[in-house]
Amino acid sequence: MDLSPRNRPLLDSSSLDSGSLTSLDSSVFCSEGEGEPLALGDCFTVNVGGSRFVLSQQALSCFPHTRLGKLAVVVASYRRLGALAAAPSPLELCDDANPVDNEYFFDRSSQAFRYVLHYYRTGRLHVMEQLCALSFLQEIQYWGIDELSIDSCCRDRYFRRKELSETLDFKKDTDDQESQHESEQDFSKGPCPTVRQKLWDILEKPGSSTAARIFGVISIIFVAVSIVNMALMSAELSWLNLQLLEILEYVCISWFTGEFVLRFLCVKDRCHFLRKVPNIIDLLAILPFYITLLVESLSGSHTTQELENVGRLVQVLRLLRALRMLKLGRHSTGLRSLGMTITQCYEEVGLLLLFLSVGISIFSTIEYFAEQSIPDTTFTSVPCAWWWATTSMTTVGYGDIRPDTTTGKIVAFMCILSGILVLALPIAIINDRFSACYFTLKLKEAAVRQREALKKLTKNIATDSYISVNLRDVYARSIMEMLRLKGRERASTRSSGGDDFWF
């Protein structure tokens, strides 16, 4: 909109609602009452988002590094020296200016500006509850106010919400997901585009069709069967048919291999496909089997020592088959949320390990010197006391090593109590982050389902085919699902004792 003086409409008290006027102390800020600029040499008018405020240059001079403080200096220079003087232009600090009426225009939020006004009046900046942390930060940065100026009553809540917003970064992550989704589904280039697209939908979108849902269920069954089969093969029970278990292992590996190969053949950017974490997990789930076969086939003509080394390698490779459990992350929002939480909370996890390490080192040393004089004591060394301190601080308490003296029992009590306190500090933060990640992923899944339904509706309209999707029902379902998720989110937030989730 053109805000030049000749095109700008005149603002008077009738064109402004009561919420647009500011009633502050006239010695600091003056509110416009009749719509005409006040004839005060120390005041000038700012128009922020359609709301007019009359400010005092004297009050703004206390904040010379802010935008309005600099504007007050420029306005004073213009009044003294005139427009032809070598003074900065007010347009460098505002969006438009009317020197005749001494009014300066800013295309910013008038609601957030009231908090800025309060800061100029009292020197204390409070956080706007209705605005997310990152948007509020953008507003105060525009006005030249540092976020460290936030008052102590709002500072902790603001920085926690800001950290959560930056970590989740909902909009950026959604945009990245959409761009990646579009790049992977460009099947126009390459052979059999229609077949590849349908196959990709079945493999990667379990809710897109009945065939995709059936395929997802079968994939979960194969993962569960392979894990149970691996456990039974290690049990060495007399009634088990090992040959049947080996055949079942071959069948499961064949399924996993075919699933991975089909995904690999469908995508266009195969290098990007191999760098994705779920595909790396799929590859690690099948590679140990083939490496084991290769090692066993090449170990036929080696010595006994070499065969022992090969046997150890084969055992290690077989242990890696437990990674198949991670394949369930493709079908479980909870597992993906757990992975996101561990990735994002590495600082809290490191802090937890640091606290435990310090406590274990201190209490194990004290307990060792308290118990070493007892005959047949189980605290034979400080490393043995490490194990006792670890099980005590984590409240596991195996009981294989226990104190016998009164002093040792007092130390054990202090060790257990400190372990409870130490574990409670970062785990609360990790729990909040997990809840936020889980609800964010659920909202993304709802958005993806809505986008797929709209694409299907658009395609049906373009081809004049039968429309089986109702636009009203699509939006109604998406809104109801988001409301349900937000309700669960608020309930989870109340149960954790905080209100620190902003989306």
Swiss-Prot record:
It comes from the Eukaryota. Residues 171-187 have a biased composition (Basic and acidic residues). Signal peptide: none annotated. Residues 3-213, 263-279, 335-348, 431-503 are cytoplasmic. The lineage of its organism: Eukaryota, Metazoa, Chordata, Craniata, Vertebrata. Residues 1-20, 171-192 are annotated as: Disordered. The gene is Kcnv1. Heteromultimer with KCNB1 and KCNB2. Interacts with KCNC4 and KCND1. Residues 235-241, 301-312 are extracellular. It is found in: Cell membrane. Its main location: membrane. It is a multi-pass membrane protein. The chain crosses the membrane at residues 214-234, 242-262, 280-300, 313-334, 349-369, 410-430. InterPro entries: BTB/POZ_dom, Ion_trans_dom, K_chnl_volt-dep_Kv, K_chnl_volt-dep_Kv8.1, SKP1/BTB/POZ_sf, T1-type_BTB, VG_K_chnl, Volt_channel_dom_sf. GO terms for biological process: protein homooligomerization. GO terms for cellular component: intercellular bridge; voltage-gated potassium channel complex. The segment S4 is probably the voltage-sensor and is characterized by a series of positively charged amino acids at every third position. GO terms for molecular function: voltage-gated potassium channel activity. Keywords: Cell membrane, Ion channel, Ion transport, Membrane, Potassium, Potassium channel, Potassium transport, Transmembrane, Transmembrane helix, Transport, Voltage-gated channel. This is Potassium voltage-gated channel subfamily V member 1. The keyword Transmembrane helix applies. Belongs to the potassium channel family. V (TC 1.A.1.2) subfamily. Kv8.1/KCNV1 sub-subfamily.
